[in-house]
């Protein structure tokens, strides 16, 4: 169970001679490698012909850490970006429709495979980084990122209608204090601690979701004890001290924002975030998040003021160089694929129409349409 893909083997498995639905199903192997809070993997998909529909999975929501479902939608946006990059790698363009407002069925977007199109070197570099991207929750060193990288990350954000703002040196201490305050506020909640514990896994887990203890540098024994301790002990002060020190010592501290704050913006910021993470991975950097500073509404508002941001901060990233970390588990494509149809709705409609004018068999029973009789 790994986010690692044996890319050459997978590429040989691409259904070159298959139909659009088979190709989309294959591309979902890359979509599911996207990051998500607590590795909840809160997405599901329907494939119908040349169209894939992306759904938010409410059963994997985090009501304590993410009461509005903002980070859940962002995770789905990151998965969608992976799928689009994979389609480009295999020579297909994609068109996308974002569904407005709040839908009871959780449908967020539709993407469709379009005509064949050659990929670009920039998109190819991002695609190749998909199986190598990790969330590095361990300490990062204080080396500066490569020259020109931050400007490149800013451009990636703009491609998706978001913007990326580096935290300036003179703003660093105030931002670190906000991170610490967010830590203390979140960890003080028994509900929040129980939620974290529920998604924390022992190192030897057979589960395909959640965060194994090794992601935090825990021993096997500690990985079993940690979720039990969280339910009874508030680690807020320790977490606040650690995270504020990491924020001050991180050379690249970045805030991703959008002009407004709705589901469309959350989805776009998830796509932008994934492009940023992949570009950083391609440059040899590690990344992780300070979710507490955007996860608490009042702290998020104060962050906007502290950095002079006119938009809505969606996520804070820290980038740097660190030790290579093990991947977290991932669910199988069959676990997140809720429906699979070879033909599109349009193709089925065309197939059914001739049946309406066919003669009734002599036995008196109507002959079934081939389209409807298919298994």
Annotate each predicted stretch with a short phrase.
Residues 1-375:
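Acidic, surface-exposed loops and disordered segments
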């Amino acid at each position: 169970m790994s986010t690692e893909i044996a890319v050459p083997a997978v590429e040989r498995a691409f259904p070159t001679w298959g139909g659009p639905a088979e190709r989309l199903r294959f591309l979902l192997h890359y979509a599911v490698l996207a990051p998500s809070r607590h590795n909840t993997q809160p997405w599901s998909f329907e494939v119908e012909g040349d169209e894939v529909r992306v759904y938010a999975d409410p059963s994997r929501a985090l009501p304590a850490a993410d009461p509005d479902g903002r980070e859940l939608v962002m995770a789905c946006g990151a998965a969608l970006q992976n799928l689009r990059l994979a389609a480009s790698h295999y020579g297909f363009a994609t068109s996308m429709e974002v569904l407005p407002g709040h839908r009871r069925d959780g449908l967020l977007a539709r993407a469709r495979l379009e005509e064949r199109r050659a990929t670009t070197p920039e998109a190819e570099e991002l695609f190749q980084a998909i199986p190598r991207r990790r969330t590095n929750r361990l300490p990062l060193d204080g080396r500066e990122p490569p020259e020109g990288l931050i400007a490149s990350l800013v451009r990636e954000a703009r491609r998706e209608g978001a913007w990326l703002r580096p935290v300036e040196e003179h703003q660093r201490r105030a931002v670190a204090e906000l991170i610490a305050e967010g830590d203390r506020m979140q960890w003080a909640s028994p509900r929040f601690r129980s939620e974290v514990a529920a998604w924390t896994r022992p190192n030897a887990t057979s589960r395909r979701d959640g965060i194994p203890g090794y992601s935090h540098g825990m021993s096997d024994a500690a990985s079993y004890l940690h979720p039990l301790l969280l339910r009874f002990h508030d680690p807020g002060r320790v977490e606040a001290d650690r995270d504020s020190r990491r924020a001050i010592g991180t050379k690249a501290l970045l805030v991703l924002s959008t002009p407004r704050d709705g589901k469309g913006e959350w989805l776009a910021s998830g796509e932008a975030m994934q492009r940023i993470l992949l570009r950083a991975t391609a440059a040899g950097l590690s990344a992780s998040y300070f979710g507490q500073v955007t996860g608490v509404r009042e702290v998020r508002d104060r962050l906007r003021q502290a950095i002079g941001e006119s938009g809505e901060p969606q996520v804070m990233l820290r980038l740097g160089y660190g030790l290579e970390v093990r991947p977290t588990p991932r669910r199988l494509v069959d676990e997140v694929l809720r429906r699979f149809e070879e033909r599109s709705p349009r193709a089925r409609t065309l197939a059914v129409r001739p049946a309406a004018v066919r003669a009734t068999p002599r036995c008196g029973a109507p002959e079934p349409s081939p389209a409807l009789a298919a298994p």
